[in-house]
Amino acid sequence: MEKTEGKIRYGLIGIGAQGGSYARFLTNAPAPFPGMVCAPCPDNCALGALCDIDPEKEKMCKEQYPDVPFFKDWKDMIASGTVDAIITTVPHYLHHEISIYAMEHGMNVLCEKPAGVRSKDVQKMIACAKAHPEVSFGIMFNQRTNKLYQKIKEIVASGELGEIRRSQWMINSWWRPDSYYQQSAWRATWGGEGGGVLVNQAPHQLDLWQWICGCLLYTSPSPRD
């Protein structure tokens, strides 16, 4: 695929449920479910390349996106010149490795949440991003695009409710059926996710909580005087 003038070419690493969603979005493909509404892809974005180690995913990608280069090795994709930015939708333990390598090779990076499993790996990733201001780096928290949460943040930020002194975030609608965990072999495994709900669903809620109410200033095991 030749470079499209004025467009950011995205390379997708990992073509599972989430990677497939990105591919459909970047190509303005029809929604996968009847009645589902999908936002149109911005005019300055394009699907540049696809990458996965699964032969079945390779077959599917070549059938659905015959004009898009496919790679089995993400390092080969980064070096190919077919992409300007990458999006990682891979097992959590790989997030920092791929992101750091890509930034060090001049690539813009959008990493799916969570940032990682081990705090030391995440700190390395953050340090790399700071060391390479010439590239853009971000963690994808898609719930921030939800208009409900955007409105809540707007109300809180306006001061309409006064100063937030204490907050409690309760979510009881984020259960997942077994079909969700069967989408990919690495889901709900220590080797793939690195934890349970605190690594899978909870990052969305923790992010929304601090995004809307502000970052935690202190912790205390008992009430302050």
Which role does the model predict for each range below?
Residues 116-179, 190:
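A contiguous active-site-proximal alpha/beta segment in oxidoreductase catalytic domains
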Residues 140-147, 171, 175, 179-217:
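Mid-domain beta-loop-alpha active-site segment that forms a flexible
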